[in-house]
Amino acid sequence: MTGILWEPIFVLIPSDPPTAPRWLDVVNISRNSAELKWTVPERDGGSPITNYVVEKRDVRRKGWQTVDTTVKELKYTVTPLNEGSLYVFRVAAENAVGVGPFCELEDSVLAKDTFSELEKNLGGL
């Protein structure tokens, strides 16, 4: 095999941001907080997911407010909320390439306690 030159071949595997998280839901709401949960994106884009970005928006406003960009779990409690305001939430996954598309709640939720103090007291009868 003399006279044959071997050269290394480099293969680049393209990576993309992850797809949107799935099944975003508000599992608990109070007058000043909302507990969110979601499931992992269908695809990580070829690079492990490093964290999630959580945003909120008061429906009376146009712009989104970033709540946290370093969420590591598949749940997060958003605080503070203004009692009596309607909110929508969204979550995006991030990997080494960047932030993917957001998964957004379809319906707004009202920031209020689930049970009033009177209802709590009557429940003990």
Residue ranges and their predicted role:
Residues 1-125:
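Extracellular low-complexity, O-glycosylation-prone stalks/linkers
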